From Swiss-Prot:
This is Coiled-coil domain-containing protein 178. One of its GO terms (cellular component) is ciliary basal body. Keywords: Coiled coil. Disulfide bonds: none annotated. Residues 153-204, 233-414, 445-470, 662-696 form a coiled coil. Signal peptide: none annotated.
Length: 867
């Protein structure tokens, strides 16, 4: 059944696809299908009639052929066989085999029964056996023929029952066969109608093919004519390309033949090349060893350079700290100057107050004449004190100017040192970049050398050139390393000088700071004196205010004047704060105010005669105040000593912390270096892992490839063994001929080897001489390059030194001019102030003479009145 189905499906597909076939081809296909159906029916019939005799099978086959012979003659598609009819009637093919097996069982039992009753029933056995055989194998005989043997069946009931069952099964099988035959006839009718329909379709398709298919083909041909032309052109192009490739193939074959000849020649002369390669490999190994030594030296130099840079950075940070401290001190000095200004303002206010008190005291001048002389003496002493104070102020100003000038000079020196450091740093960076470039060039050369080692069979001369270049570069690097070591020594010396200058600057700073502290102590003592006098004068004024209420109105007016003057002074203070750099104007104002104070003191000397009565009380109070001030001075000295001890302890702590920080920085650098080493080791391990992975993949691929090659070789081995057996016979015949040719060729090869050895020796000698001359030339060239670079660097250094010298000259000229300008301004201001002081002194002397004359007149008048 499977075979018939496949045949039918294949035939239908062929008919559907091959619609445009001719009628003869259709007839041939029909005949093939008919033969296939006949073969399928024969197979099914042979299966159904399994176990039957040859005569019955032949008769059955003839009867079936008579029924289906007319049907199978015109069938195009495969029609159902016996099995197909059984499948339609739901009776499987093994039912017939089952019936045959039952009949065989019955026959065996009958034979056993006959053997038992041979002696007594010979005649009955003959008749029964013949009848049983007829009943078994004649399927179409009626049932009435069994009656003559009823008497014999009564004697064997078992046999009778078995015969009845067998007959009932045979009748049932015959009925099923009849139904199967009717179903098969209906299926035949359906298949015939299907055949007719298919024939009609085939005829209609053939008519369509004859009528419309040529037009459709022509249209398609016209539609795709351009494509066909393009395809033809492409085919021609491909043919031309094929010819071109064939030509290239022939050329490549010729070139391959030449290369093969060269390879054979190189294989013959391989030992010489191997020896040469071994020598070059040894040279390369020595070169790599030297290169590693140079790299170690380079790393050490880099580490030392990093340490020097760190030391420079530390020095720069220290210098910045020193500068910040100096700036803080300057800021504190400015604050002290502002405090002095405030005190001057307070003194001015006191001066105004004293002037008001002098006006009030003028009323009592006539009564107290004797006390005036003592007041004059006190005024003289106060003048002397004022003169000493003014001198002290001038000294302080000079010291402050000197300190500012020194500070500026130190700042300039610091800036110069920083500029020198950055210039040196730039040169070091340039040199480091040059070294890095050279290192990159060395790495590139090494990679090129490795690639050239792989290609030694092709580029032997190039390898020799590159080895010489590497030797030349090595000498260059050695000279550069020497130069770097010299530069390192110079930098170390320069750093030592910088450290010395920094130490000197620190000592100067501490000395100046100590001097400023002493000056501050002196200023504090002067302030205390002024405060004592202020308290004394306040007490006097309070007594005078209590003595006379009349003076209050005048005091209110004076206070209003003071408020106005204070506002004006506040404005002046704002102006002074805006122009702190211009110190000349406040100095002039201070000198004017000092002159005013002196003139007022002279006026006070006239007015202080009334205060002589309270002199004793004041002296006692002054003594008490002096004692208190002495006690306070002792306390302040103790406090100053404690602060100095604390300051020294703080400085010691700072130095200890600095040393600790240096130690920690060193440890941090060591840890960073260890981290870098670990990272480099990690990178190297990663690289080795990747290399091992790649090697593992390649080895696995090679193993698989080797396995496939081994299998292929094992298959070829069998073929080769057969070929070897055949070729051995040929080899024996050809061996004699080849032995003769071998002797001739050996003689030729010996001669050629002698010639090749001679040529190789000559080539080696020439190469040695060439390499020697080349090394000499490169050494001379390297020396010239180093000399040229050194001369160029010296020229550049000379030019830079000249420029620096000219710039320094200009700078110092400008500094001298600036200092001269300041000195000239200061001298002019001092001369003006001296002239003013002299004028004031003359006026004061005149006033004193007038006052003395006035007092003399007063004394003369009183005496006359008394007389």
């Amino acid at each position: 059944m499977t075979e018939n189905k496949t045949v039918s499906s294949s035939s239908t597909r062929d008919d559907q696809t091959n619609i445009g076939l001719t009628c003869q081809e259709v007839k041939a296909l029909r005949e093939k299908a008919w033969s296939r159906t006949n073969e399928g029916n024969a197979m099914s019939q042979s299966l159904v009639l399994y176990g039957a005799s040859k005569e019955n099978s032949e008769g059955f086959h003839e009867s079936k052929m008579t029924n289906t012979e007319g049907v199978n003659k015109g069938i195009y598609f495969s029609y159902p066989c016996r099995r197909h009819s059984c499948a339609v009637v739901n009776i499987p093919a093994p039912c017939v085999n089952k019936m045959i097996s039952h009949i065989q069982d019955v026959e065996s039992k009958i034979q056993e029964h006959l053997k038992r009753f041979e002696t007594s029933f010979e005649e009955w056995s003959r008749t029964s056996s013949t009848k049983d055989l007829k009943e078994d194998w004649s399927v179409t005989t009626p049932v009435k023929e069994v009656k003559p043997g009823e008497k014999r069946d009564e004697k064997c009931p078992e046999l009778k029952q078995e015969m009845e069952t067998l007959l009932s099964e045979a009748i049932r099988l015959i009925k099923s066969l009849e139904t199967d035959r009717a179903d098969a006839e209906e299926a035949l009718k359906q298949q015939r109608s299907r055949k007719n329909m298919i024939n009609m379709k085939i005829d209609s398709w053939s008519v369509w093919k004859l009528q419309e298919l040529p037009l459709a083909v022509q249209k398609e041909h016209e539609a795709y004519l351009s494509d066909v032309i393009e395809l033809q052109w492409h085919l021609e192009d491909k043919a031309n390309q094929l010819q071109h490739f064939e030509k290239q193939k022939t050329e490549l074959e010729e070139a391959n033949a030449k290369i093969q000849a060269d390879i054979d020649y190189m294989n013959e002369h391989g030992p010489l090349l191997d020896s040469k390669q071994n020598q070059e490999l040894q040279d390369l190994k020595n070169h790599y060893k030297k290169k590693m030594e140079v790299m170690d030296l380079h790393r050490k130099v880099n580490e030392e350079l990093e340490e020097a840079l760190e030391a420079c950075e530390n020095a720069r940070l220290k210098a910045q700290q020193i500068k910040e401290e100096i700036d803080k001190d300057i800021y504190q000095d400015e604050k002290t100057i502002e405090a002095y200004k405030r005190e001057i303002y307070q003194l001015n206010s006191l001066f105004d107050h004293y002037s008001s008190s002098v006006i009030n005291v003028n009323t009592n001048i006539e009564e107290k004449e004797e006390e005036v002389t003592e007041a004059i003496r006190e005024t003289k002493s106060s003048k002397n004190e004022l003169h000493s104070l003014s001198k002290m102020l001038e000294d302080l100003r000079r010291v402050y100017d000197q300190l500012t000038w020194k500070q500026k000079s130190h700042e300039n020196q610091y800036l110069e040192a920083v500029n020198d450091f950055y210039a040196a740093k730039k040169t070091w960076d340039i040199e480091l970049s040059d070294v890095a470039k050279d290192f990159s060039a060395i790495s590139l050369a090494c990679t090129k050398l490795t690639e050239d080692n792989k290609k030694l069979e092709i580029d032997i001369n190039k390898i020799t050139v590159k080895t010489n270049e590497s030797i030349r570069k090595k000498s260059k690097y050695e000279s550069e390393i020497k130069y770097l070591t010299i530069m390192k020594l110079k930098n170390d010396k320069h750093l030592k000088n910088i450290y010395k200058e920094a130490y000197r600057i620190g000592t100067l700073f501490h000395l100046t700071k100590h001097k400023t502290d002493e000056m501050e102590d002196k200023i504090a003592e002067v302030r205390r004196k002024f405060k004592g006098r202020e308290e004394f004068l306040k007490k006097l004024t309070q007594g005078e205010v209590a003595a006379g209420m009349v003076l209050q109105k005048k005091l209110y007016s004076i206070y209003e004047v003071q408020a106005l003057e204070r506002k004006e002074l506040i404005k002046n203070r704002a102006i002074c704060a805006m122009s702190l750099a211009e110190l000349q104007e406040p100095l002039l104002q201070l000198e004017d105010e000092a002159e005013r104070i002196r003139s007022l003191d002279k006026e006070h000397s006239v007015m202080l005669n009334n205060i002589i009565d309270q002199k004793d009380l004041i002296r006692r109070k002054v003594g008490k105040v002096k004692k208190k001030l002495r006690k306070k001075g002792k306390k302040t000295l103790d406090a100053l000593i404690e602060t100095e001890s604390k300051r020294s302890a703080i400085f010691k702590d700072l130095e200890a912390t600095k040393s600790k920080t240096m130690i920690f920085y060193a440890k941090i650098n060591e840890l960073n270096e260890e981290l870098k080493a670990k990272e480099e080791e990690k990178k190297s391990f990663d690289q080795t892992l990747e290399i091992l992975k790649n090697k593992f993949i390649t080895m696995r691929f090679k193993r698989e490839h080797a396995q496939t090659v081994f299998d292929h070789y094992m298959q070829e081995k069998k073929d080769c063994e057969e070929r070897i057996f055949e070729e051995d016979q040929r080899f024996r015949v050809l061996l004699a001929v080849r032995q003769k040719t071998l002797q001739d060729t050996q003689k030729i090869i010996a001669d050629s080897l002698e010639e090749n050895l001679r040529l190789a020796q000559e080539y080696q000698q020439l190469q040695i001489t060439f390499l020697k001359e080349k090394d000499n030339y490169f050494n001379i060239y390297d020396k010239q390059l180093s000399l040229d670079t050194s001369i160029r660097d010296k020229k550049q250094l000379c030019q830079l030194q000249r420029r620096m010298h000219t710039l320094w000259q200009e700078h110092f000229k400008l500094v001298v001019l600036f200092s001269q300008m300041r000195l000239a301004n200061f001298q002019t201001d001092s001369q003006e102030s001296i002239q003013k002081i002299l004028a004031v002194q003359e006026e004061s002397s005149n006033l004193m003479q007038h006052i003395l004359g006035f007092f003399q007149t007063l004394t003369d008048g009183t005496c006359e009145n008394d007389g």
